């Protein structure tokens, strides 16, 4: 089943979002998918171009509830973290999702958004899978209690694989559990589709359960 709704945030930003779920969705995890820059706007059909929504459009079903919001055209996910959190909170309540089974993934701009959202709300997620993304390396300490499985094509010239390499290495240096899965011979869009279609990325996300909900301070919080 699929529901498409519109959310108006507390600061009056409008965002469309889809929720795909099986008939019996009791006790299932929530997977949040953040799309890339080319799928922004108000035409929700654009969201189905890549990643998990593309698989949903093709008829694939998952043993999970899938939330896939659409970023407004004038923003990027890194600017929409608070608004995204409002939608996640709504879906968790609406579908009675257990808070230890919420996971996050995204590709390209959504890969960056995955890193950023997880660093803003690490206590919210049981695990993350950024695909062809990157972020702010000095903030990776926020992820030390969160499993990270990153994916990136080694022929990606849109977002170089070095972006994922730096984030994974920084997370590990802070004591986190992070790994980079290199998609050999693949570029940007084809690498993204390969990660979701031909690897066990989704199955691994479904297997994650959160056990540590403690607050992790920013580096600057520890200094003052």
Language model regions located:
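Gly/Ser-rich "nucleophile elbow"/oxyanion-hole loop immediately N-terminal to the catalytic nucleophile
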Residues: 26, 72-109
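Active-site machinery of serine-nucleophile hydrolases
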Residues: 30, 34-83
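Short alpha-helix in the alpha/beta-hydrolase fold that links the catalytic acid
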Residues: 46-47, 160-170
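Short beta-strand immediately N-terminal to the catalytic nucleophile in serine-hydrolase-like folds
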Residues: 104-106, 131, 151
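A conserved short beta-strand
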Residues: 123-134
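Short beta-strand/loop motif that positions the catalytic acidic residue
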Residues: 149-152, 156
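Histidine-bearing beta->alpha loop at or near hydrolase active sites
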Residues: 153, 183-190
């Amino acid at each position: 089943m699929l529901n498409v709704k519109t959310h108006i945030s507390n600061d009056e930003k409008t965002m469309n979002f889809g929720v795909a779920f099986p008939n019996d969705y009791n006790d299932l995890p929530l997977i949040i998918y953040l799309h890339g820059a080319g799928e922004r706007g108000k035409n929700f059909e654009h969201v189905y171009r890549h990643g998990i929504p593309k698989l949903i459009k093709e008829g694939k079903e998952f043993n999970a509830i899938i939330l896939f919001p659409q970023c407004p055209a004038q923003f990027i996910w890194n600017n929409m973290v608070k608004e995204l959190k409002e939608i996640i909170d709504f879906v968790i309540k609406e579908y009675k999702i257990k808070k230890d089974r919420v996971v996050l993934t995204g590709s390209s701009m959504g890969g960056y958004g995955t890193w950023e959202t997880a660093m803003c709300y690490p206590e919210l997620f049981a695990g993350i899978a950024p695909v062809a993304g990157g972020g702010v390396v000095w903030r990776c300490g926020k992820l030390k209690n969160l499993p990270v499985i990153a994916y990136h094509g080694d022929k990606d010239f849109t977002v170089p694989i070095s972006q994922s390499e730096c984030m994974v290495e920084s997370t590990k240096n802070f004591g986190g559990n992070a790994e980079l899965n290199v998609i050999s011979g693949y570029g940007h869009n084809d690498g993204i589709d390969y990660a979701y279609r031909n690897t066990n990325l989704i199955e691994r996300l479904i297997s994650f359960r959160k056990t540590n909900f403690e607050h992790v301070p920013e580096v600057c919080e520890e200094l003052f």
